[in-house]
A protein has these predicted regions:
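Canonical AAA+ ATPase core
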Residues: 143-176, 183-186
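Interdomain "pre-motor" coupling segment immediately N-terminal to P-loop NTPase/helicase cores
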Residues: 1-21
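Conserved small/polar residues in nucleotide/adenosyl-binding loops
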Residues: 189-191
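Conserved catalytic/switch belt of AAA+ P-loop NTPases
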Residues: 126-147
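Dynamic helix-loop-helix/coil hinge segments at AAA+ ATPase domain boundaries and subdomain interfaces
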Residues: 16-37
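Conserved P-loop NTPase "ATPase switch" module shared by AAA+ and STAND
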Residues: 113-129
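Loop/turn-to-beta-strand initiation segments
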Residues: 83-84, 115-118, 146-152
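Conserved P-loop
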Residues: 37-115
Length: 191
């Protein structure tokens, strides 16, 4: 009983410290709302093999179609299995990294985000970012490459990522590292 209680507290702590915007699970997602989604593929993420294989998951689709909900559901499942997990909006991530750089703590902050087994970066490309921010994101993605899993949500197709970062070469470098060993969930449409 005591071991079970300790385990429950540890799981609760993992979920609480992950910073999820809400606590929604796979059971809360209405797959009939998104008939183009491969439900089997999405539910297969519950087994968390993608973490063991250091694979990424990228959700691409219009605003309001459930990308954040699904990314959060996967993250909650990972945290419940005691994998270090963190959720952050892309603009907040870049702002935190820039603040750390101005305080001469950039490497520490970069390492902080790089160490999570699962890092969820929400809304990549919702707002464009300057070259400094794009370089910081590249450094983070590069540091995590083939070491940990990253989950991305974006409303921009990959062919338009150069618009986000204002640099074709940098966009290609980020995409190269993200897309290698990735599960890409496309065609999330707003009905």
């Amino acid at each position: 009983m005591e071991i079970e209680l300790r385990n429950e507290k540890a799981i609760y702590g993992c979920v609480r410290t992950a910073g999820f915007p809400f606590l929604k699970t796979f059971d809360d997602f209405d797959f009939s709302f998104q008939p183009t989604l491969n439900k089997e593929q999405i539910l297969d993420f519950k087994n968390l093999r993608f973490i063991e294989n250091n694979e990424n998951i990228i959700f691409v689709g219009s605003p309001g179609v459930g990308k954040t909900h699904l990314a959060t559901s996967i993250g909650i499942k990972a945290a419940q299995n005691r994998n270090s997990t963190y959720f952050i909006n892309c603009n907040d991530l870049i702002a935190n990294l820039k603040k750390a750089q101005s305080e001469n703590r950039f490497i520490n902050r970069l390492n902080h985000y790089a160490r999570y087994k699962v890092l969820i970066i929400d809304e990549v490309g919702f707002l464009p970012m300057d070259l400094d921010g794009a370089n910081m994101l590249f450094q983070l993605i590069n540091k995590r490459y083939e070491k940990h899993s990253t989950i991305i949500t974006t409303n921009k197709p990959f062919g338009k990522w150069h618009e986000i970062f204002n640099d074709v070469t940098l966009a290609n470098a980020i995409l190269d590292r993200l897309l290698h060993h990735s599960h890409i969930i496309l065609s999330l449409i707003h009905i």
